[in-house]
A protein has these predicted regions:
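Conserved SAM/SAH cofactor-binding pocket of Class I
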Residues: 30-91
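Class I SAM-dependent transferase core
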Residues: 2-41
Length: 91
């Protein structure tokens, strides 16, 4: 599914990283707390399992993580939100 095919909104993180969300795939403060708790070192490889709209991996990027990060999401709509956010920002 393409982002153009679904209704979505854009949330902007502290350092201007954009997160695309939908009515079904959005995030709350618990996801931001998880991202801080599990934050990898700057160049460390990382995995974001059950990534949804990609808030954890995008928060890591926003906070300076530049290592390889693999985000895994089974729901096509959610994974397209992350894929499109990455493409739109050149990440």
């Amino acid at each position: 599914m393409q982002l153009a095919d679904m209704e979505h909104s854009t949330e902007i993180l502290y350092n201007k990283t954009e997160v695309f969300c939908s009515a079904v795939h959005r995030f709350g403060s618990d996801a931001l707390l998880l991202a801080r708790f599990a934050e990898p070192k700057r160049l460390q490889r990382a995995a974001d399992l059950c990534s949804g709209c990609g808030i954890v991996s995008l928060e890591w990027h926003d906070r300076g993580h530049r290592g390889e990060c693999t985000a895994v999401e089974l729901q096509p709509e959610a994974s397209s939100l992350l894929r499109e956010a990455l493409a739109a920002q050149g990440i």
